[in-house]
Swiss-Prot record:
Compartments, record wording: Cytoplasm
InterPro entries with a match to the protein in the record: Alpha/beta_knot_MTases (IPR029028), RlmH-like (IPR003742), tRNA_m1G_MTases_N (IPR029026)
GO cellular component annotations of the record: cytoplasm
Transmembrane segments: none
Function: Specifically methylates the pseudouridine at position 1915 (m3Psi1915) in 23S rRNA.
Reactions the enzyme catalyzes: pseudouridine(1915) in 23S rRNA + S-adenosyl-L-methionine = N(3)-methylpseudouridine(1915) in 23S rRNA + S-adenosyl-L-homocysteine + H(+)
Protein name listed in UniProt: Ribosomal RNA large subunit methyltransferase H
Binding-site residues, S-adenosyl-L-methionine: 73, 104, 123-128
Length: 157
């Protein structure tokens, strides 16, 4: 199974890149994850948000492997606690398909991307910078892996 994190945005702040690298390294023992960065559309005072969403959506679609199981990060998705995410991860690994997590740009995902999603996952009602979401996602995937292996990292319940 191949696992991708497709994230719109490049040139992340150093502290995000460092945090991502640390959790990516830790996660690699349980779930090899490849980060694919999608070039964001140009934004300025006269930019058209819908056009940006559609352009980024086309780039995301082009980056997808064949027949992926797509989990889209979406504010309207299902919120999961850490234990629920661990259960979902166990389910996803059992599917035998390429697993893809999709993080959109500042305005979100195109309808085309939402339409191919098998699941939508919400990190909650907070508004988060999309660059920070990649760090949160990789940490939560690592936490889920540690729950599944009874590693002491997760100290819930």
């Amino acid at each position: 199974m191949k696992c991708l994190l497709i994230a719109t945005g490049q040139h992340v702040p150093t502290w995000v890149a460092q945090g991502f690298a640390e959790y990516h390294r830790r996660l690699s023992y349980w779930l090899p994850l490849e980060l694919v960065e999608i070039e964001p559309s140009m934004r300025g005072k006269n930019h058209d948000p819908q056009r940006a969403i559609e352009d980024e959506g086309r780039r995301v679609m082009a980056a997808l492997p064949k027949q992926p199981y797509a989990v889209t990060l979406d504010v309207k998705g299902k919120p999961l606690n850490s234990e629920q995410l661990a259960q979902r991860m166990e389910h996803w690994r059992g599917l035998g398909r390429n697993l893809v997590f999709l993080i959109g740009g500042p305005e979100g995902h195109s309808q085309e991307v939402l339409n191919i999603s098998n699941e939508r996952w919400s990190l909650g009602p907070l508004t988060l910078p999309h660059m920070l979401v990649r760090l949160i996602v990789v940490e939560q995937l690592y936490r889920a892996a540690t729950i599944l292996t009874n590693h002491p990292y997760h100290r819930g319940k």
